[in-house]
Amino acid sequence: MKGKKNITLVAEEGASLSSGSLRLYALPYGAVDLYGYDPLNRRAAVGIMVAREFRRQGYALAMLHALEELSTANYQIHTLFADIATPNAASIALFAKAGYSQCGLFRDWLVVKEQYVDSIRMQKILK
């Protein structure tokens, strides 16, 4: 990544996390999702999608950092987590680089190309 990427996350008009999930766009780079929101325990799951032409350029990491800032400032979220298919080495590396640590393993949890694969859970406790 050359230089720090400044990312602005934008939700669709009228969207809120009160429904349990929220998609935020970082156009033209991609989008991040908060889902499975648990307001009592102040945690949510994270999903991320990066447009193919912007991959491996630091945008995903910048999007995660922007999501973390928004999560603490707007929703008082304490913990973010992601469930990642074990064959997805790029995603595992991204979340590790962002400071997430592995906290669980789910056997035969996801179907990828018609095959069951394990999934790891990675989490980050936000300050």
Predicted features and spans:
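Conserved GNAT acetyl-CoA-binding A-motif
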Residues: 73-83
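Terminal substrate-recognition subdomain of acyl/acetyltransferases
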Residues: 115-127
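Conserved acetyl-CoA-binding loop-helix of GNAT-fold acetyltransferases
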Residues: 50, 56-73, 89-97
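Conserved active-site tyrosine of GNAT-family acetyltransferases
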Residues: 95, 100, 122
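Acetyl-CoA-dependent GNAT
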Residues: 1-55, 125-127
